[in-house]
Amino acid sequence: MATPNRLWMALLLLGVLGVLQTPAPAQAALQPNFEEDKFLGRWFTSGLASNSSWFLEKKKVLSMCKSVVAPAADGGLNLTSTFLRKDQCETRTLLLRPAGPPGCYSYTSPHWSSTHEVSVAETDYETYALLYTEGVRGPGQDFRMATLYSRSQNPRAEVKEHFTTFAKSLGFTEEGIVFLPKTDKCMEEHP
């Protein structure tokens, strides 16, 4: 019969090995040969997926927003998003700083003062772009989000299906995926 110390040690080793064998969350690939100049211009945020408790609570009241990507003076990108909030159009600009290979950026969250990494995982530049964002919002509050950008307010069904597959490949569940409804406000078609 094994001694209590040996049983404890065996359980500890099994636990450590089990943790080491637990797969890490999937990482999004990066768009090969990303061409930043083709990524510039107007996009509509058409779909989101997240593990954030805030997102899961608020996803039913979110609506599509318009974003404009423009070059920044320091070589990064300005991402200016206009969205409906409390029946008013609100505009916010984030500075996306280059953070590695082309298509990989970082920004400081205005709400949490934490750094988030965002990467353009896939795009055809003319129809859609799939983005992946991750960061930490506080102790034990990892933040991950997949975003579907589309050049029009009506992304094709195949694009939506492709986004769903992308989001699920990153570990997001059906409950954490939402396609944002269009709104008549704040969505002018011109840039």
UniProtKB/Swiss-Prot annotation:
Residues 1-28 form the signal peptide. One of its GO terms (molecular function) is prostaglandin-D synthase activity. InterPro entries: Calycin, Lipocalin, Lipocln_cytosolic_FA-bd_dom. Its EC number is 5.3.99.2. It catalyses: prostaglandin H2 = prostaglandin D2. It comes from the Eukaryota. The keyword Membrane applies. It holds the Pfam family Lipocalin. Catalyzes the conversion of PGH2 to PGD2, a prostaglandin involved in smooth muscle contraction/relaxation and a potent inhibitor of platelet aggregation. Involved in a variety of CNS functions, such as sedation, NREM sleep and PGE2-induced allodynia, and may have an anti-apoptotic role in oligodendrocytes. Binds small non-substrate lipophilic molecules, including biliverdin, bilirubin, retinal, retinoic acid and thyroid hormone, and may act as a scavenger for harmful hydrophobic molecules and as a secretory retinoid and thyroid hormone transporter. Belongs to the calycin superfamily. Lipocalin family. This is Prostaglandin-H2 D-isomerase. The lineage of its organism: Eukaryota, Metazoa, Chordata, Craniata, Vertebrata.
